Amino acid sequence: MDNLSDTLKKLKITAVDRTDDSLEGCLDCLLQALTQNNMETSEKIQGSGILQVFASLLIPQSSCTAKVANVIAEIAKNEFMRIPCVDAGLISPLVQLLNSKDQEVLLQTGRALGNICYDSHEGRSAVDQAGGAQIVVDHLRSLCSKTDPASEKLLTVFCGMLMNYSNEKNDSLQAQLINMGVIPTLVKLLGIHCQKAALTEMCLVAFGNLAELESSKEQFASTNIAEELVKLFKKQIEHDKREMVFEVLAPLAENDAIKLQLVESGLVECLLEIVQQKVDSDKEEDIAELKTASDLMVLLLLGDESMQKLFEGGKGNVFQRVLSWIPSNNHQLQLAGALAIANFARNDGNCIHMVDNGIVEKLMDLLDRHVEDGNVTVQHAALSCLRNLAIPVVNKAKMLSAGVTEAVLKFLKSEMPPVQFKLLGTLRMLIDAQAEAAEQLGKNVKLVERLVEWCEAKDHAGVMGESNRLLSALIRHSKSKDVIKTIVQSGGIKHLVTMATSEHVIMQNEALVALALIAALELGTAEKDLESAQLVQILHRLLADERSAPEIKYNSMVLICALMGSESLHKEVQDLAFLDVVSKLRSHENKSVAQQASLTEQRLAVES
């Protein structure tokens, strides 16, 4: 290392004299020392103050320029040397050298800039300010189609530099590269050089960095990236290499156009093959790959076009294979199968076909296996399927007679909000316009008590909202006195009154219709609860508020008329001077509201 100190002193003097021969000797010594012990040599270089000297040596006409760039590339392998390289003013002269015609200068300069950018925000910012990215993108464009070894070497270095440059938490550098049109160039490069492992890997990492950005998706969609990635994926045997392709596929597959391209390029068949190969393995990496493949499969089904293409009228091979995952003993496959079915069940035609072909029984069997200490994600996914399947009118009766309500009610004791939410949604869909089922459920005291409890789940707005909506639905669809009595006895009335003040018009309306039925069918039973929940005051507010939707005003007036049958509520109506508010509504632009206002006004006048 004494030798190194001499070299550094000599280099300082030589740098001033610019005698290329002795300069070259000094640089060779440095490179040798860096090969033997990079870290220690780099520390010495930093301590010697020679970095500033390097800036003056990075000149296009010198025969030593490539070696200087090589020394910088080597020292920048150390994290602690990157900011000193920036501070020494090396970036600007290095970026200037990117315009050189000398292959070796370009190669070493690309390495130096790439290493300085690695994991260094300061390095990337300096390259950005010096305009380095655009020059590198232009080089990639012109070299892209060349397959000679020297060009491929350069391509690998420049690709590596862009990979490090784009690996920034701040999106602005990635957005800048996208605007420079780097994506089509990299996709073309991947297609031409797919046999070259190092180049391919760098392309993939750069894609991964760019694919997270929404603005990149359109550019990717206009290339043949799907075809190239699937081609590459099929070739990979090693787990790590496949993982790299997966990391690009997942963010890209969030875009519907790319989903369809991936499906058309045969990705689904590859994924199904992986599932088949890995399903019985207990190796950690195989389990991880099975999860990635099945998750990606579900993601592809989130696009309407890609989903329909794979459904093929329920006859498709993919649909059949996914169906076979549900009875599997592998939790990950059960989950992916249920999520996939939930995605297929996004249109009525598919839902009707699946119910007619026995999907409900398969899902109920799956749920049955997860009742006691079951897998929450599987429960949630299976309930999501049943909820979607229950949307078409023709499916409701079939699902009810298949025993879906009984299967779903087994999860009433669940303490997991996602499961509670889907359970409520499924029941609400099932009883829509099904009077008998609504009555049966509405008289189920355990269910109604649980609903009332969940109506107070303030930490889980979704569960709270769905509980309220199901309470209202039980009344609206059953129109049953017994159901109303059960809800009154369980303390549900106050929640329906609160629901009438919801910020969602649909929920307000459902509450008002249910309350009108209560007032028409069981006013005596509910009277005290309606009073203590301050229903009359709330109705006055809804009618007086100009922001209330027409249907809210209409149903509020219908409800006021229905409440007149109760002495105490009637008195509250009189005390609040409803006539003033209602008479103003006679000139409302909505005809139904205006008409109902006239009727309500007459009723109020007669009863006063």
UniProtKB/Swiss-Prot annotation:
GO terms for biological process: CAAX-box protein maturation; protein localization to nucleus. ARM repeats lie at residues 89-131, 171-212, 348-391, 392-432, 480-520. Its main location: cytoplasm. InterPro entries: ARM-like, ARM-type_fold, Armadillo, RAP1GDS1. The keyword Secreted does not apply. Residues 122-171 are annotated as: Prevents binding to prenylated RHOA. Acts as a GEF (guanine nucleotide exchange factor) for the Rho family of small GTP-binding proteins (G proteins) that stimulates the dissociation of GDP to enable subsequent binding of GTP. Additionally, appears to chaperone the processing and/or trafficking of small GTPases containing a C-terminal polybasic region independently of GEF activity. Targets include RAP1A/RAP1B, RHOA, RHOB, RHOC, RAC1 and KRAS. Regulates mitochondrial dynamics by controlling RHOT function to promote mitochondrial fission during high calcium conditions. It comes from the Eukaryota. It is found in: Cytoplasm, Cytosol; Endoplasmic reticulum; Mitochondrion; Nucleus. The keyword Endoplasmic reticulum applies. The modification N6-acetyllysine is found at residue 231. One of its GO terms (cellular component) is nucleus. This is Rap1 GTPase-GDP dissociation stimulator 1. GO terms for molecular function: guanyl-nucleotide exchange factor activity. Interacts with RABL3. Interacts with RHOT1. Brain. The N-terminus is blocked. Forms covalent cross-links mediated by transglutaminase TGM2, between a glutamine and the epsilon-amino group of a lysine residue, forming homopolymers and heteropolymers.
